[in-house]
Regions:
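N-terminal secretory signal peptides that target proteins for export/translocation
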Residues: 1-4
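N-terminal maturation segment of proteins
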Residues: 6-372
Length: 372
C-alpha cells in the first residue's frame, strides 16, 4: 500500500468513526438517555419545541421555524395526556444522573427542573381543572395573535403556510371543544361572566353580535375584510415585490375564502357551544366551586408560592401585612402633619395626591422636572 493510499485509508476510517460517534450521540440525544445532563436539558427543550409548532413560531427558532410553519399545535385530549406522561419520563431520566458529580450550576438546574416536574405531576388529579377558553387567553385570541405577530410573511412559502394554517383552524377548535366537553361532563364549567365575555369577544372577532335566541346577526358589511387575519395579510402582501398583482389578488382570494368558511365557522361553533353552556353556568367564580376545589386551591397555592402554607395561613399573613402597612402609613402621615382621624386613609392619600407640589405638567418640561 502506497503512502497516499495509506493516508486515504486512515482518513476514511477516521471520518467514518466520527460519523458513527456523531450518530450514536444524536441517537442517544433524541431517542434514549443522553450521555451527560447538559445534553438532557437540550433534549427536553428540543422535544418541547418539535411537539409545539406554535411555540417554534413564537420563538422564531431557525430551521425549525420553516419545518413547522404550516402546522398548529395539537390541542387534543390525547396529546395533553401524552405530554403529561412525558413529564414522568423526564423526571425519571433526570433522577438517573448522579447529583453529586454535577457542577454547582447544574445542581441548581437539576433542583429547579426536578421541583417543576414533581409539581406538575402532583397536579394529575386536577388535570382538567381550568378554563382553556376564557376572557384573558385561549385559542380564540391566541391563534389570531400568533398569525398576526409571529407568522412571517416574507415570500410565497410563508404565504402558502399562512393559508394552510388558516385551513386548520377548524380542526384546532374541534380539539379545544373536545376538552371543553370533557370538563363539562366533570362539572368544570366557567362562571357566567367568563362565558359572556368570551362570547362577546368571539362574536366581535367575526363581525357579528349574539341575540337572545343564539342566532347571530351581521354587524359589519363584510367582516372578513375588516378582520385582523385579512388586513394583516393584505398589508404584508403589499410589501412583497416579487409577486405580480395577479398573484397577489389570487392569494387574497384564498385567504378571504379560508377566513369566511373555515375560520368563521370554527368561531361560530365555539360561540354556539358557550351559548348552550350558559344554562349550566353560575355566578360562583372561585375554584372552591370545582370538584375537590379546596384541594385544588391548596395545590395552586403550593405551585405558585413554592411553600407548604395553608390557605388560612396565607390569608392571615395578608391581614397582618395590611395592618402593618396601614400602621406605618399613619405614623408617616402623623409625622408630616397629615393625620386626620375623621377621614379614611384612602381619603387622606387622595387629597395628598392633589397637592400642587406633587403635580407636574404632562409635557417634556414636566417630565424633566420629575427626573431632576
Amino acid at each position: 500500500m502506497t503512502k497516499k493510499r495509506t493516508w486515504k485509508f486512515w482518513a476514511g476510517r477516521t471520518i467514518l468513526g466520527l460519523l458513527v460517534i456523531g450518530g450514536l450521540w444524536l441517537t442517544n440525544l433524541i431517542w434514549f438517555r443522553p450521555f451527560n445532563i447538559n445534553h438532557f436539558y437540550d433534549k427536553v427543550f428540543i422535544e418541547l419545541a418539535i411537539s409545539d409548532p406554535e411555540l417554534v413560531t413564537q420563538l422564531g427558532i431557525p430551521v425549525l421555524y420553516d419545518i413547522y410553519k404550516e402546522d398548529l399545535s395539537d390541542a387534543s385530549d390525547k396529546k395533553g395526556w401524552e405530554d403529561f406522561l412525558k413529564l414522568k419520563d423526564d423526571l425519571a431520566a433526570l433522577q438517573s444522573y448522579d447529583f453529586e458529580s454535577q457542577s454547582k450550576e447544574n445542581k441548581l438546574n437539576t433542583k429547579i427542573l426536578s421541583w417543576y416536574l414533581r409539581k406538575q405531576i402532583e397536579g394529575e388529579p386536577f388535570f382538567y381543572h381550568g378554563y382553556p377558553v376564557n376572557q384573558m387567553f385561549g385559542v380564540q385570541s391566541n391563534l389570531p395573535s400568533l398569525m398576526e405577530s409571529s407568522h412571517k410573511l416574507r415570500d410565497e412559502s410563508d404565504i402558502e403556510a399562512y393559508i394552510i394554517r388558516l385551513s386548520k383552524f377548524g380542526a384546532k377548535f374541534d380539539q379545544v371543544l373536545e376538552g371543553l366537553r370533557i370538563r363539562e361532563e366533570k362539572g368544570i364549567i366557567p362562571p357566567q361572566f367568563v362565558i359572556d365575555r368570551v362570547i362577546s369577544e368571539m362574536s366581535g372577532f367575526i363581525g357579528k353580535k349574539g341575540s337572545n335566541h343564539i342566532n347571530l346577526e351581521i354587524t359589519n358589511e363584510d367582516p372578513v375584510k375588516s378582520n385582523i387575519l385579512y388586513t394583516h395579510f393584505n398589508s404584508k402582501l403589499a410589501q412583497l415585490e416579487d409577486l405580480t398583482d395577479q398573484e397577489k389578488k389570487a392569494y387574497k382570494i384564498k385567504v378571504e375564502n379560508e377566513i369566511r368558511t373555515t375560520v368563521f365557522e370554527a368561531y361560530g361553533a365555539l360561540i354556539l357551544y358557550f351559548e348552550a353552556l350558559k344554562s349550566k353556568a353560575t355566578t360562583e367564580d372561585g375554584v372552591w366551586k370545582l370538584p375537590d376545589g379546596n384541594d385544588f386551591y391548596q395545590y395552586q397555592l403550593s405551585e405558585n408560592t413554592t411553600t407548604d402554607y395553608t390557605p388560612d395561613k396565607v390569608h392571615q399573613i395578608g391581614l397582618s401585612e395590611v395592618a402593618r402597612i396601614k400602621t406605618e402609613m399613619w405614623d408617616l402621615l402623623t409625622l408630616e402633619g397629615y393625620a386626620d382621624t375623621t377621614k379614611t386613609l384612602g381619603e387622606i392619600i387622595q387629597k395628598l395626591n392633589k397637592e400642587e407640589r406633587f403635580l407636574y405638567q404632562n409635557n417634556d418640561e414636566g417630565r424633566k422636572e420629575v427626573i431632576d
